[in-house]
Amino acid sequence: MQEKYTPLDVEQAAQSHWTAMDAYRVTEDSSKKKFYACSMLPYPSGKLHMGHVRNYTINDMLTRYLRMNGYNVLMPMGWDAFGLPAENAALKNGVPPAQWTFENIAYMKQQMQAMGLAIDWSREVATCDPSYYKWNQWLFLKMLDKGIAYRKTQVVNWDPVDQTVLANEQVIDGKGWRTGATVEKREIPGYYLKITDYAEELLGQVQTGLPGWPERVKLMQENWIGKSEGVRFAFTHDIRDASGALIDDGRMYVFTTRPDTIKGVTFCAVAPEHPLALHAARGNPALAAFIEECKTGGTTEAELATQEKKGLDTGLIVTHPLTQLPVAVWVGNYVLMSYGDGAVMGVPAHDERDFAFAKKYGLPIKQVVQVDGEQFDYDQWQDWYADKQRGVAINSGSFSGMSFKQAVEAVAHKLAALGLGEKKTTWRLRDWGVSRQRYWGTPIPIIHCPEHGAVPVPEKDLPVVLPQDCVPDGSGNPLHKHEGFHAGVVCPICGVAARRETDTMDTFVDSSWYFMRYCDPKNEKAMVGEGAAYWMPMDQYIGGIEHAILHLLYARFWTKVMRDLGLVKVDEPFTKLLTQGMVLNHIYSRKGENGAKDYFWPNDVENVSDETGKVVAAKLKVAVGNLPAGTLVDYEGIGTMSKSKNNGVDPQDLIERYGADTARLYTMFTAPPEATLEWNDAAVEGSYRFLRRVWNFGIKLSTIDMIAVDESTTGATALNDINFSKEAKVLRLEIHTVLKQVDYDYQRMQYNTVVSGAMKMINALENFKATDSGGAQVALIEGFGILLRCLYPATPHIAHSLWQGLGYAGTLGDLLDAPWPQVDELALLQDEVELMLQINGKLRGAIVVSAGASKVEIELAAIDSEVFRKLANGATPKKVIVVPGRLVNLVV
């Protein structure tokens, strides 16, 4: 072995060794316990970031540890390769998205290999490969046949200049990101998946089928699915269209979870697209203009929640079903046509949004719920106004005096008797719109015939292959203009010339089942095969909390659809979920001459702190652009690493300077996996120094008689026949005590304490000085072998190199499959124990006694101790108190 630790040489040699033996290729083996661990597949954006390094190292540590414990472990990797960034890059660089994507995949794969990850690359998938997305199309056709997929109109963001649909993130302050044009809302047809058919099961299994998921994520899923128990009822009206027919049969339906407040309704609000709104707008230019204004707002519930609530009176009146009083109908920009019936009742006294709306537009407020001891203020909202648990109905006729539950039942019964309403369960969850008016995605397998309309592509003609030579120019859908995509296409029914569907699928489709394709990635005849039966469900899934809702919910839904189609047998795809914390770094900025913020790399800045250590200012250490060193900049605190904030750390730079093992070790040691990690350059240096200490100790150990390295000195047996000295026993006690804790921490995936345990081991080994005492060499060799195996999942390269170089592999085989060290319970037994010595209740020192000493022996040892004799001045104790294993107290 080379004397100096040179990480790049060590890591290249280890990786070459693993590559030569095809170390990570995994096959199904029914004789072994299986474990499937997977990180969420990355988008090939160009380079790995530190969040990737952390995620994949967590996965790698888990799989290596389990492999040493006899498991058949699968750790695959793939690429979530479709999506908008590739189109944006194509616009910027003038290259096809396919070229940009595959170049990025090649580079990021090389980075992963440099990290030493135990990935089975034979199972690699890229979602932009026709052999993969063929099965997206195949399952879509199956869902279409089963009625799970269907077509309807959808509201989208439309850029009138580029003549294209924009994703929500491409709309900035109501304008297109490229053209600056005011974005319009348009209704266009698209395909949806009936995820709502699975709402009850998706919700029910959150608590029963996801035992290894964080409670936070389960709560987020429950809230997103959003089961609501309430009443759906109608306000009647006599509003007729131009032909004289009643609009919606003279009924405007709403849903409420607070039917106990029905007598407090003072207005209703409808969505801008509601039939009553459109009817009223025909003779009302101001209302028509307001409806057009609403079309430039957000289309999602989240966007509507944050935007200013606006409304306009339609002039229409509906009738309250219980009071028969007239109720004004307003158009509200906060009401979505896609939610419920596109209309809501307004109860300003008991809903905070309605209260603000009523105060803004001078609408009546009627209190119908009272909490004992509270005073209602019509000018200021108070949280108790919406308290249904403590509230009692007032000003509500026959319902007055009722609790929430009583009033719900009574109101529902009354409305049902009138034929105007009924109790109903509704869901916040909406069907999944999968059509995207983009180029770089899975083509939807539909052909549009002038005679037969939308016709499914026959299965034998799959996949419908996406053209690879498109370079989007930002105007319109490239697939509309790509004649090669439509060339020779005929209707499967009548054979006449037709055109393909030019919408592509939402990229969440790609990521909803890739983990099943890993199980059988080369299968050309089936979407999934026998591999899925062996590996699924996945035992451990690892990814960011940002995917807690959509990706995980869609993956659960997709799995249930595949189950119902007989493709898999599992109900839930992921048994356990770990959401790793973000990697954070300092953020520094300064307003430029144009008013925009410029961000500075933290390594170019130094902080100015007060006496408490609080950062009070920051300045440039070096010149940056036209700014000289010493220029003051603003310190914005700690935030997530990102390109936009210029506070990222390039893993490649870290690996080239310190090695992959240091990068891996640092990201694991600094914080528990689920917690955020605050970047600290000094701690990175500390991780490197620790590995150098391990290497140096290995070099030192190589100078002693390594013939002693055999099965009896590597922790595999209890070493009963060796006469260990007192010092060697103490070393073995320390090593095996830490090993017991480290093993427990590995099982809990608390990798930060695993690393701290390894540091305790190297301290114990370095501090051992009795190298010539009985059994000393054996204890050292055993201890270092245990340390290498404990470190191996975190820092596999250095552990492999030392394991091979010191001869451990000759007995126990390659570290890949070496058995995990077993705790020697005999080593944990102590010959002597140290007890605290107190005199008159005050700690004065300690005594060492035999581990099996009796109470009398302990008393005598304490009385005979030098400390007691010195302080007692010849006096004898009046009383001796012994607490076994802890202390002895002499009362004088």
From Swiss-Prot:
Protein's UniProt keywords contain Cell membrane: no
Keywords: Aminoacyl-tRNA synthetase, ATP-binding, Cytoplasm, Ligase, Nucleotide-binding, Protein biosynthesis
'KMSKS' region (motif): residue ranges: 640-644
This enzyme's EC code(s): 6.1.1.4
GO MF term set: aminoacyl-tRNA deacylase activity; ATP binding; leucine-tRNA ligase activity
Gene3D superfamilies associated with the record: 2.20.28.290, 3.10.20.590, HUPs, Isoleucyl-tRNA Synthetase, Domain 1
UniProt motif 'HIGH' region: location: 42-52
Record InterPro entries: aa-tRNA-synth_I_CS, aa-tRNA-synth_Ia, Leu-tRNA-ligase, Leu_tRNA-synth_edit, M/V/L/I-tRNA-synth_anticd-bd, Methionyl/Leucyl_tRNA_Synth, Rossmann-like_a/b/a_fold, tRNAsynth_Ia_anticodon-bd
GO BP annotations listed: leucyl-tRNA aminoacylation
Source domain of life: Bacteria
Catalytic activity: tRNA(Leu) + L-leucine + ATP = L-leucyl-tRNA(Leu) + AMP + diphosphate
Gene Ontology CC: cytosol
Binding annotation for ATP: K643
Stored PROSITE patterns: AA_TRNA_LIGASE_I
Subcellular location(s) of the protein: Cytoplasm
Any single Pfam family the record assigns to this protein: tRNA-synt_1g
Main location: cytoplasm
Stated family: Belongs to the class-I aminoacyl-tRNA synthetase family.
Name of the featured protein: Leucine--tRNA ligase
Species the sequence originates in: Albidiferax ferrireducens (strain ATCC BAA-621 / DSM 15236 / T118)
